[in-house]
């Protein structure tokens, strides 16, 4: 029996399409014949419907997954205000506990062939006074996929984030170029620069390039990702 696969999705910033790309990967894994589930361990920003608190990002992931986890397993920490998690958690009297997230991830692996874990914000977003999302990625011990929001400044953001991932002893399994600014000048040149630098310095391939979509369509974006290459990388990372 093949061991389940998993990856941690981070981004160069907030609002650059991590959830969109994570949903696209879930569709891609499903097309690859895998049972795909999502974890959004920490979500900041909730709305109430039918007496239940929900999160839009988590809803998008559920819509894309072909294995839908119970809400308390998929998102053990759902914060109401859409702001920095450690600030909101303190105000709401919640402790964002990494061990709890690791336990949820362990359980999720028993229910799917692949589990996509989406972080919150960028790679180093504080969860407590002493721990951040980089510590979470280390605790999970997962290969990382970096979503680069292609806009002015993305080259430095991508290279800095890749360096931070390596400094934590984690594998950068690849990256996705997600075009968030349709009016950006020299977009092709920016993507080419990031591709060359990340390949040379980290051996990290470009897994796909997604044009600006309005509205965003994760199912269509899935066809733009090299899921076969990603699966191969994730399997190699297990050995």
UniProtKB/Swiss-Prot annotation:
Pfam families listed in its UniProt record: AAA_26 (PF13500)
What pathway is this protein said to act in by its record? Cofactor biosynthesis; biotin biosynthesis; biotin from 7,8-diaminononanoate: step 1/2
Which cofactors, by name? Mg(2+)
> Which keywords describe this protein according to UniProt?
ATP-binding, Biotin biosynthesis, Cytoplasm, Ligase, Magnesium, Metal-binding, Nucleotide-binding
Q: Which residues form the active site?
A: 40
Entry's InterPro entries?
A: DTB_synth_BioD, P-loop_NTPase
Summary of the function given for this chain in its UniProt record: Catalyzes a mechanistically unusual reaction, the ATP-dependent insertion of CO2 between the N7 and N8 nitrogen atoms of 7,8-diaminopelargonic acid (DAPA, also called 7,8-diammoniononanoate) to form a ureido ring.
Chain residues that bind ATP: 15-20, 57, 118-121, 178-179
State the protein's name. Answer: ATP-dependent dethiobiotin synthetase BioD
**Does the record bear Membrane in its keywords?**
no
Q: Is Nucleotide-binding included in the keywords of this UniProt record?
A: yes
Under catalytic activity, the entry for this protein gives:
(7R,8S)-7,8-diammoniononanoate + CO2 + ATP = (4R,5S)-dethiobiotin + ADP + phosphate + 3 H(+)
For the ligand (Mg(2+)), the binding residues are 19, 57, 118
Q: Subcellular location, in the record's words?
A: Cytoplasm
| GO cellular component terms, A-Z | cytosol
- NCBIfam families (alphabetical): bioD
- Per the UniProt entry, what are the Gene Ontology biological process annotations, in alphabetical order? biotin biosynthetic process
| Assembly behavior | Homodimer.
EC number per UniProt: 6.3.3.3
Which family, according to the similarity comment?
Answer: Belongs to the dethiobiotin synthetase family.
Select a single GO molecular function from the record's annotations and give it.
ATP binding
Q: Which domain of life is it from?
A: Bacteria
